[in-house]
Amino acid sequence: MGKLLVVMLIGMFLAFESLEALDYGDALNKSILFFEGQRSGKLPTNQRVKWRADSGLSDGASANVNLIGGYYDAGDNVKFVWPMSFTTTLLSWAALEYQNEITFVNQLGYLRSTIKWGTNFILRAHTSTNMLYTQVGDGNSDHSCWERPEDMDTPRTLYSISSSSPGSEAAGEAAAALAAASLVFKLVDSTYSSKLLNNAKSLFEFADKYRGSYQASCPFYCSHSGYQDELLWAAAWLYKATGEKSYLNYVISNKDWSKAINEFSWDNKFAGVQALLASEFYNGANDLEKFKTDVESFVCALMPGSSSQQIKPTPGGILFIRDSSNLQYVTTATTILFYYSKTLTKAGVGSIQCGSTQFTVSQIRNFAKSQVDYILGNNPLKMSYMVGFGTKYPTQPHHRGSSLPSIQSKPEKIDCNGGFSYYNFDTPNPNVHTGAIVGGPNSSDQYSDKRTDYSHAEPTTYINAAFIGSVAALISSS
């Protein structure tokens, strides 16, 4: 009866299967293209998103540093280094784990460029050994305006962490991002790879030596889970990048920091650490067994029919963790589910035990696939939550640049308050932000498609970054 229940529950998530096969290669292409619409700084000549133009060209000038470039993290015009670094780590993880699949659809070059746009900014933000700029722009004033990034005239206030004002979460994540990216570029640009790795080591030492929570000094994107997860995350990536035993010994010595959780996010990296180190456990590092146990607890908390299930799905089948920007948690969850199912397959392990219920690798992978398919249109509304994918998708994402006329079509400045006349129009955004994945439906699988509903309509870089690895995992089987 238990096995029948599991089959029935997993079958529920496939009930909205469309007759047409989903084009995962197209979804991957558009997921990557999204990042070109989020770029800050001087845009390159090969920029494909033509409704964007140069912006933020004096960022950092108030402190005589160059903080030009990087990504606007969501629908606003502020640059937050902590979530930008997490975004970059996820992008690099996808490039490393699914290189063949991404190459198969001719997207590896674009993905590397996307990663480099992020790492170049992180390198600039790391201005000295114990100094990292963590934010460019005043979030409060920016959020009170509705302006194109090309027009923005709100203060480009700078925030930073240092030995006297630490933020181990931000420094640790930046270290993880650069370490992961160093592997991406190792065989194609060894000089750049070495630069990334050296900065990663420096940032990790800074984060670990001057331990302190970013919660104490952050204006936005504050820490709620502490910094231990970022320190383990950085050390795990540095071990992957270097093979140096000191990093392995670090995670072994601090393995008790790891805890069983049910989400993976810009704030909480434990599930990512656990997945990475469980892979090392299966490679022979027996002292890492706790991480294997903990990542399996994460998987069991998500799987429908599990006796230890903690996260319940909507009636239509999507995991529902929080109402605000729920798809960020779904895409990161599928990142772990696909990665760990691949780890188990490589290790010759066919299943895991979740209390009284056993799940095969195929069941774990199929459930992850159902989440990707829901996002791409196999859901009760028969709509894709990725802008520009399929025939029905969000038309009013909560995004300043997308919702205002492009500077090419309307060169005249649109000031802080002037933009709200466009914000309040109940019409599709004039610029289609292809590839943007919005926050997603509510707990009843409903979506209003109103840009005023930022909790559900706002895209973010880390939603897309997590989705790239998940959709790439399906390309070989599509």
From Swiss-Prot:
The active site is at D76 (nucleophile), H398, D449, E458. It comes from the Eukaryota. Pfam families: Glyco_hydro_9. This is Endoglucanase 18. The keyword Hydrolase applies. PANTHER family: ENDO-1,4-BETA-GLUCANASE. One of its GO terms (molecular function) is cellulase activity. Keywords: Carbohydrate metabolism, Cell wall biogenesis/degradation, Cellulose degradation, Glycoprotein, Glycosidase, Hydrolase, Polysaccharide degradation, Secreted, Signal. InterPro entries: 6-hairpin_glycosidase_sf, 6hp_glycosidase-like_sf, Glyco_hydro_9, Glyco_hydro_9_Asp/Glu_AS, Glyco_hydro_9_His_AS. One of its GO terms (biological process) is cellulose catabolic process. Its EC number is 3.2.1.4. It is found in: Secreted. It catalyses: Endohydrolysis of (1->4)-beta-D-glucosidic linkages in cellulose, lichenin and cereal beta-D-glucans. The lineage of its organism: Eukaryota, Viridiplantae, Streptophyta, Embryophyta, Tracheophyta. It is an enzyme of class 3 (hydrolase). Belongs to the glycosyl hydrolase 9 (cellulase E) family. Glycans are attached at N29, N442. Residues 433-452 are annotated as: Disordered. One of its GO terms (cellular component) is extracellular region.
